Structures are given as structure tokens and as C-alpha cells.
UniProtKB/Swiss-Prot annotation:
GO BP term, example: DNA-templated transcription
Location within or outside the cell: Host cytoplasm; Host nucleus
Protein name per the record: Protein E7
Highest taxon of source: Viruses
Organism of this sequence: Human papillomavirus 58
UniProt key word Metal-binding: yes
Modified how: Highly phosphorylated.
Similarity remark: Belongs to the papillomaviridae E7 protein family.
Amino acid sequence: MRGNNPTLREYILDLHPEPTDLFCYEQLCDSSDEDEIGLDGPDGQAQPATANYYIVTCCYTCGTTVRLCINSTTTDVRTLQQLLMGTCTIVCPSCAQQ
């Protein structure tokens, strides 16, 4: 605004929307490439899918927060959950040294 009284001309912009190409240029891998990655284990069995899981719990001894990151299958995470619900506990590094 340049004057004491604003005018409509000062608020109208000269911008116009530009068309955007929404086509995805991503190329999928050939299925023959998956065989080279090693999806099959040494015994010919397919490897189970793994993922990162973050575990936040308290130290059994002092109660401080302990954070773990594991890479496992869902079945093994359930097994770990059952162990932690039982007698298996996690302690922090400072309590582990004592």
C-alpha cells in the first residue's frame, strides 16, 4: 500500500495458477531384479518380512526411561512381548554396570 487509503487495485494480485503435471514418472523394478536381491534364504525358503520396532520402557532397578530399537518379525516381537510380561526385565546401562 502506497497511499493513505487502500484501494482495491493494491489488493488484486497478478498471479495466475499454473498447470501442474500430475503424471508420476516413477518406474517399477522388473520382477527379475527381485531374484537377484536375495529374497530366498539359503535353504530356498522365503525370508519373513522384518520391520523396525521401537520399545520404550522403564528400567527395572531405577525406573528411568529405556529406549530400544529392534529389527524383527512380528512373530518374534510377540515372543519378546511375552518374555517382558513375564520374569524377563530390562535395565538401563548405568544399572547394568553395578
